[in-house]
């Protein structure tokens, strides 16, 4: 039987007590720390959150791997470099925004910095989106977020607008 691994997410925490929260979930047995980074476009109800500053602030408070799940439409070498410098172990990208050559470059940049790579794919996104990269990634997340509070519709997450 496979062991279930628990990642402690930091999206809805009191950032004034972040170090204490990270210590607490580490001691409670979380296998990963899951941080998010969002721009002002993809995740409208949680704008401009996270990033390398958060990871830099918590790195010394846990020995667990820290993954950074980005909700952005772009990801350049400078961003990856900053994440690597502060001790990020895995970068998780939305497949709908990073397909083909851009994703291949990002995977290579991460590997050169000893980082793992994951992809998220929305519930209604065709699996063909990840066909060419499935063997190059370390993890795949199927995103099934609930009702979008911004408009009250059952759109199953922030990426549904990418497929309209």
Question: What does each model-found stretch correspond to?
Answer:
Residues 116-121:
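Internal catalytic-core helix/loop-beta-alpha segment
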Residues 90-93, 109:
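Structured N-terminal alpha/beta-domain signature
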Residues 106:
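Short, aromatic/basic amphipathic alpha-helical patches
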Residues 123-126:
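A glycine-rich beta-strand to alpha-helix segment
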Residues 95-99, 144-149:
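Short, acidic/turn-prone active-site loops that include or flank metal/cofactor-
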Residues 1-88, 98-101, 111, 130-138, ...:
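Conserved N-terminal beta1-alpha1 strand-loop-helix module at the mouth
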């Amino acid at each position: 039987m496979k062991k279930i691994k628990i990642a402690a997410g930091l999206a809805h925490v009191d950032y004034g007590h972040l170090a204490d929260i990270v210590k607490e979930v580490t001691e409670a047995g979380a296998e990963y720390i899951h941080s998010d980074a969002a721009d002002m476009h993809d995740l409208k109800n949680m704008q401009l959150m996270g990033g390398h500053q958060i990871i830099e602030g918590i790195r010394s408070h846990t020995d667990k791997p820290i993954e950074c799940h980005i909700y952005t439409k772009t990801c350049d070498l400078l961003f990856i470099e900053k994440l690597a410098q502060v001790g990020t172990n895995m970068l998780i990208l939305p497949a709908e925004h990073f397909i083909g050559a851009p994703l291949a470059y990002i995977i290579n940049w991460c590997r050169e910095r000893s980082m793992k790579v994951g992809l998220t794919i929305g519930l209604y996104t065709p699996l063909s989106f990840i066909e060419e990269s499935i063997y190059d990634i370390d993890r795949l997340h199927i995103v099934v977020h609930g009702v979008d509070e911004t408009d009250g519709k059952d759109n199953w997450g922030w990426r549904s607008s990418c497929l309209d």
